[in-house]
């Protein structure tokens, strides 16, 4: 087990420091999960995972319950997940994951952000091949026998396991699987009584690119602008 290399997060995860935006994103995730599998987390593994992320973000229980109730109602908003691809300045590839109830509005806004920050919104498939979609779990390492855990999870889809750092600088164990094995690995982790700090699918850059600080800052300004958009859930890039 080694240290997992992760692309720069200085602003990639900036929204997690803006609580209202965090809760909006999670509320949409709840709505999508409930729509797909119902409001009971015991029988809906996707919802169960989203609720774990809500707890990790310190989302108040009343807000979580309200989001589930709204998503269960007949007038619930029907969100569509749309992935946009493009380039930031200096050839850095971006994947922009959105959850929208108005695709026309969303694509116009995403294009505006790219244009304003010297980027280029591309077509489907233009940069997706530079990433691998994976299931990513982050665990608190306290009390874990990491060698034993790694051996046990290999049979359930584990591909990579290594050390990482959380948003507040805390140590974490990062576990990755192929996206197709996400559910299987989630079940194996839960069967061991472990509660992940977070669990989600992510687009992991295959070949991260290093840039000088001044050029990297230009890229991250576009990433930050996209992340502030109401329809954008997450932004992935291959900036090292």
From Swiss-Prot:
One cellular component term from this protein's GO annotations in UniProt: cytosol
Keywords: Cytoplasm, DNA-binding, Transcription, Transcription regulation
InterPro entries membership: Integrase-like_N, TACO1_YebC-like_2nd/3rd_dom, TACO1_YebC_N, Transcrip_reg_TACO1-like, Transcrip_reg_TACO1-like_dom3, YebC-like
One GO MF term attached to the UniProt entry: DNA binding
Subcellular localization(s) per the UniProt record: Cytoplasm
One GO BP annotation of this record: regulation of DNA-templated transcription
Secretion signal span: none
Stated family: Belongs to the TACO1 family.
NCBIfam families the UniProt entry points to: PRK12378.1, YebC/PmpR family DNA-binding transcriptional regulator
The name this protein goes by in its record: Probable transcriptional regulatory protein MXAN_7062
Species annotation: Myxococcus xanthus (strain DK1622)
Organism classification: Bacteria, Pseudomonadati, Myxococcota, Myxococcia, Myxococcales
């Amino acid at each position: 087990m080694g240290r997992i290399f992760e692309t720069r997060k200085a602003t990639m995860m900036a929204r997690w420091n803006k609580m209202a935006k965090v809760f909006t994103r999670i509320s949409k995730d709840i709505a999508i999960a409930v729509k797909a599998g119902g409001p009971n987390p015991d029988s809906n593994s996707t919802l169960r995972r989203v609720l774990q992320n809500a707890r990790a973000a310190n989302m108040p229980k009343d807000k979580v319950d309200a989001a589930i109730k709204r998503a269960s109602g007949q007038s619930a908003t029907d969100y569509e997940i749309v992935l946009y691809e493009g380039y930031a300045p200096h050839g850095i590839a971006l994947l922009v994951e959105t959850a929208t109830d108005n695709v026309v509005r969303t694509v116009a806004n995403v294009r505006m952000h790219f244009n304003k920050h010297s980027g280029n919104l591309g077509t489907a498939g233009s940069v997706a091949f530079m990433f691998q979609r994976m299931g990513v779990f982050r665990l608190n390492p306290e009390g874990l026998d990491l060698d034993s855990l790694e051996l046990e999870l290999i049979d359930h889809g584990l591909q990579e396991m290594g050390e990482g750092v959380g948003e507040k600088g805390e140590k974490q164990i990062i576990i990755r699987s192929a996206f197709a094995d996400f559910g299987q690995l989630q079940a194996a982790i839960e069967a061991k009584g472990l509660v992940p700090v977070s669990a989600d699918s992510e687009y992991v850059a295959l070949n991260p690119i290093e840039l000088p600080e001044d050029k990297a800052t230009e890229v991250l300004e576009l990433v930050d602008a996209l992340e502030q958009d109401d329809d954008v859930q997450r932004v992935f890039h291959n900036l090292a």
